[in-house]
Curated annotation (Swiss-Prot):
Encapsidates the negative strand viral RNA, protecting it from nucleases. The encapsidated genomic RNA is termed the ribonucleoprotein (RNP) and serves as template for transcription and replication. The RNP needs to be localized in the host nucleus to start an infectious cycle, but is too large to diffuse through the nuclear pore complex. NP comprises at least 2 nuclear localization signals that are responsible for the active RNP import into the nucleus through cellular importin alpha/beta pathway. This is Nucleoprotein. Late in virus-infected cells, may be cleaved from a 56-kDa protein to a 53-kDa protein by a cellular caspase. This cleavage might be a marker for the onset of apoptosis in infected cells or have a specific function in virus host interaction. Homomultimerizes to form the nucleocapsid. May bind host exportin-1/XPO1. Binds to viral genomic RNA. Protein-RNA contacts are mediated by a combination of electrostatic interactions between positively charged residues and the phosphate backbone and planar interactions between aromatic side chains and bases. Residues 1-22 are annotated as: Disordered. Disulfide bonds: none annotated. The gene is NP. GO terms for biological process: symbiont entry into host cell; viral penetration into host nucleus. It is found in: Virion; Host nucleus. Its main location: virion. A motif (Bipartite nuclear localization signal) lies at residues 198-216. GO terms for cellular component: helical viral capsid; host cell; host cell nucleus; ribonucleoprotein complex; viral nucleocapsid. A motif (Unconventional nuclear localization signal) lies at residues 1-18.
Length: 498
């Protein structure tokens, strides 16, 4: 990991700031979420939502999507140049749910994008506040990560569905900037690069001309982002090879897939942030909380605190379990889709189940679903402890990489060993160590073989009582090793259809 001096913290990325001290970061992150909260309150007024309707997570998501759509310049330009029948490129909207005569009814609203942009800027001191938009994108991405498995997308790019723990942020839009890049998993970056290389193989002009030069710059930038996520010299050296290739093709795809597999044990450094739905920030602002003055952090106690006293509702389908719906949203709020379930369970204070055992579908309701049978229920988003979010893959103190269970990318900086089935992973590495990356491949395989499942990661790091805001008394939990730790283990979650 590079020393902190050369890297902006991800709150700085998040707020587009230069190097700032801790208080300035807390203030600028506070300003960002405060702006989201003010915007949400204003939208509730525009839409004439009651208090309860404003606390409905489905309404929050619709409002968030409207503002993201209003600021999506590339798509707006495309829509204006390719008008489709029945769609006004200058308008945006979605389903808003209201309580009428003891039932929830769906109403489709439409607004001018210009009007939404005006309300957003007004809530953010007249600025575009791109950081706040990215924050909403990351919340949607975390929700997707907890809800869907990306098996199909993995198979399409020639990767193994068992690599799903590397897919954090796979549904983030391209325009999500540095903060978005920080939360993307190794598998997500590999997949983006493979798609790019495949286009280059199929389309002769992809790398040529003025456009091709821009494409090449984007390719090298993505390679550097991925390289920065790896924590061992051999993995980074292989990324240099991929980046410097004159004409990227199958050899590079092979190398990238090899690197993705290696990341199951030699894990990459991927940032985690607790991004909450807009209505949560709205509730806090409405109750008089001044985020900018108080300061806020996405990786400390603040989001836990906020969720302790926020009441958020969700629509529930007839055969869904409200407790399971709550777990899904809790995991999304803390970006914990790929965390070890033992750690999540300890922090939440209730058992966190694997995805396949949850009786719940996604949070959003499709337009053809019957509203007559919909109920609503309060989401239980509180926790027993809090823990610092990590941006490292959790390696031991020596630069020898520690082991990672297939399907874990730690979210919380909490001491644990990372059990994994080495045989399963190593089986994927038979043979192919020839070619220009042979020495690096051999070195990576050697490191993987030497990593022991019983190695402890995040030594001495623990969870904290919710009263311990300065994180002075770490409680180091002991875990029952017999429990399966991965969320998408042996799973049947729905696919995410992009």
């Amino acid at each position: 990991m590079a020393s902190q001096g050369t890297k902006r913290s991800y709150e700085q990325m998040e707020t587009g700031g230069d190097r700032q001290n801790a208080n300035e970061i807390r203030a600028s992150v506070g300003r960002m979420v405060g702006g989201i909260g003010r915007f949400y309150i204003q939208m509730c007024t525009e839409l004439k939502l009651s208090d309860n309707e404003g606390r409905l997570i489905q309404n929050s998501i619709t409002i968030e999507r409207m503002v993201l759509s209003a600021f999506d310049e590339r798509r707006n330009k495309y829509l204006e140049e390719h008008p489709s029948t029945g769609r006004d490129p200058k308008k945006t909207g979605g389903p808003i749910y209201r309580r009428r005569d003891g039932k929830w009814v769906r109403e489709l609203v439409l607004y001018d994008k210009e009007e939404i942009r005006r309300i957003w800027r007004q809530a953010n001191n007249g600025e575009d506040a791109t950081a706040g938009l990215t924050h909403l994108m990351i919340w949607h991405s975390n929700l997707n990560d907890a809800t869907y498995q990306r098996t199909r997308a993995l198979v399409r790019t020639g990767m193994d569905p068992r690599m799903c723990s590397l897919m954090q942020g796979s549904t983030l839009p391209r325009r999500s900037g540095a903060a978005g890049a920080a939360v993307k998993g190794v598998g997500t970056m590999v997949m983006e690069l493979i798609r790019m290389i495949k286009r280059g193989v199929n389309d002769r002009n992809f790398w040529r001309g003025e456009n091709g030069r821009r494409t090449r710059i984007a390719y090298e930038r993505m390679c550097n982002i991925l390289k920065g996520k790896f924590q061992t010299a051999a993995q980074r050296a292989m990324m240099d090879q991929v980046r410097e290739s004159r004409n990227p093709g199958n050899a590079e795809i092979e190398d990238l897939i090899f690197l993705a597999r290696s990341a199951l044990i030699l894990r990459g450094a991927v940032a985690h942030k607790s991004c909450l739905p807009a209505c949560v920030y709205g509730l806090a602002v409405a109750s008089g909380y001044d985020f900018e003055r108080e300061g806020y952090s996405l990786v400390g106690i603040d989001p836990f605190r906020l969720l302790q006293n926020s009441q958020v509702f969700s629509l529930i389908r007839p055969n869904e379990n409200p407790a399971h719906k709550s777990q899904l949203v809790w995991m999304a709020c803390h970006s914990a889709a790929f965390e070890d379930l033992r750690v999540s369970s300890f922090i939440r204070g209730t058992r966190v189940l694997p995805r396949g055992q949850l009786s719940t579908r996604g949070v959003q309701i499709a337009s053809n679903e019957n509203m007559e049978t919909m109920n609503s229920s309060t989401l239980e988003l509180r926790s027993k402890y809090w823990a610092i979010r990590t941006r490292s893959g959790g390696n031991t103190n020596q630069q020898r990489a520690s082991a990672g269970q297939v399907s874990v990318q730690p979210t919380f900086s909490v001491q644990r060993n990372l059990p994994f089935e080495r045989a399963t992973i190593m089986a994927a590495f038979t043979g192919n160590t020839e070619g220009r990356t042979s020495d690096m491949r051999t070195e990576i395989i050697r490191m993987m073989e030497n990593s022991r499942p019983e190695d402890v990661s995040f030594q001495g790091r623990g969870v904290f009582e919710l009263s311990d805001e300065k994180a002075t008394n770490p409680i180091v939990p002991s875990f029952d090793m017999s429990n399966e730790g991965s969320y998408f283990f042996g799973d049947n979650a729905e696919e995410f259809d992009s």
